[in-house]
């Protein structure tokens, strides 16, 4: 291997490491910034009663679309956390109880990277069912 080729290879490796490091730092910084719903959205009331069937529907949606990152019990320990190096919200955090249903609904609807927006993927009723189910997750 020539000296010039070694230099180029070393430079490519160094650039890759620097870019990867920058992405990790940016990802962590983004995950720590606050995410507040607009006041009008936060004031919305949940029109879907937390009936047994609504909670079952919410649990099914959660298992299918949320647990991969947020974990089965909302502890932010789903399998994608390690694979994708993401830091999802810990839905079992007692602070979540201070969020209004409207705020949770808005966050589910609009998303924030790396969390996708579900406004077009889930019906309005499904999103409210999801809010109801998230409320049942144990807080610790």
Task: Label each region the model flagged.
Residues 31-61:
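Electrostatic cytochrome c docking/interface patches
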Residues 75-76, 124:
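Short, non-ligating residues that shape and space the ligands of small metal-coordination modules
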Residues 83-137:
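Extracytoplasmic electron-transfer domains, predominantly the class I c-type cytochrome c fold
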Residues 1-7:
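N-terminal secretory signal peptides that target proteins for export/translocation
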Residues 35-37, 79-84:
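Short, flexible, mixed-charge acidic loops at enzyme active sites
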Residues 12-22:
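Bacterial N-terminal signal peptides
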Residues 23-29:
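Sec/Tat signal peptide C-region and signal peptidase I cleavage site
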Residues 52-75, 81, 104-110:
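Sequence/structural segment immediately N-terminal to covalent heme-attachment motifs in c-type
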């Amino acid at each position: 291997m020539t000296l010039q080729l070694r230099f180029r290879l070393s430079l490519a490796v160094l650039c890759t490491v620097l870019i990867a490091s920058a992405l990790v730092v940016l990802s962590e910084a983004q995950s720590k910034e606050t995410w507040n719903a607009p006041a009008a959205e936060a004031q919305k009331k949940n029109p879907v009663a937390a009936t047994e069937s609504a909670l079952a529907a919410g649990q099914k949606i959660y298992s299918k679309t949320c647990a991969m990152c947020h974990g089965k019990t909302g502890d932010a320990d789903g399998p994608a956390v390690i694979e994708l190096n993401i830091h999802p919200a810990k839905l079992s955090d007692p602070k979540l109880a201070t969020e209004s249903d409207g705020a949770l609904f808005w966050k589910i609807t609009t998303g924030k990277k790396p969390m996708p927006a579900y406004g077009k993927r889930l019906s309005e009723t499904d999103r409210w069912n999801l809010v109801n189910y998230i409320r049942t997750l144990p807080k610790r």
